[in-house]
């Protein structure tokens, strides 16, 4: 991890621990959200259970590197996000280093994925 990174502030993308999280998305909606249409039209969702996708997740999923993510985190999510379920954090939050000591989680009520017109006061 680059020592210049002193904190993380991910906004609306809390899809860490991708594989169980994306399966939860499908089960919760009974299919894919309309927002994922470009991905399922290209049949990319078919590969979510493929061993090569598991291999890719091991590289691109920040959850894989959670032991190195020891800096404070402010996670900002939207309660009305079209892409991601608002309970995704249950698949990763408790596994983050210092989850309850140094990290904060904010849910913007009624905000969609674009977050336009919303602000966070911390």
PLM regions: where:
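Active-site nucleophile elbow and catalytic-triad environment of alpha/beta-hydrolase enzymes
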Residues: 15, 48-65
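Primarily recognizes the serine-hydrolase "nucleophile elbow" in alpha/beta-hydrolase
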Residues: 1-26
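Regulatory input/activation interfaces that engage signals or partners
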Residues: 21-28, 35-36, 41-45, 51-54
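Conserved structured core elements
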Residues: 2, 60-63, 67, 82-86
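Short beta-strand/loop motif that positions the catalytic acidic residue
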Residues: 69, 75-77, 81
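Loop/turn elements at helix/coil->beta-strand transitions in domains of secreted/extracellular proteins
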Residues: 3-7, 70-72, 98-103
């Amino acid at each position: 991890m680059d020592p210049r990174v002193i904190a993380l502030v991910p906004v609306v993308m809390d899809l860490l621990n991708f594989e169980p999280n994306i399966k939860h998305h499908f089960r919760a909606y009974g299919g894919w959200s309309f927002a994922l249409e470009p991905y399922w039209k290209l049949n990319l969702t078919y590969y979510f259970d493929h061993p090569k996708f598991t291999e890719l997740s091991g590289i691109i999923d920040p959850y894989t590197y959670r032991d190195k993510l020891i800096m404070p985190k402010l996670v900002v999510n939207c309660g009305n996000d079209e892409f991601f379920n608002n309970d995704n954090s249950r698949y990763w939050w408790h596994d983050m280093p210092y989850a309850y000591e140094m990290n904060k989680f904010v849910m913007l009520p009624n905000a969609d994925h674009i977050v336009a017109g919303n602000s966070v006061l911390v």
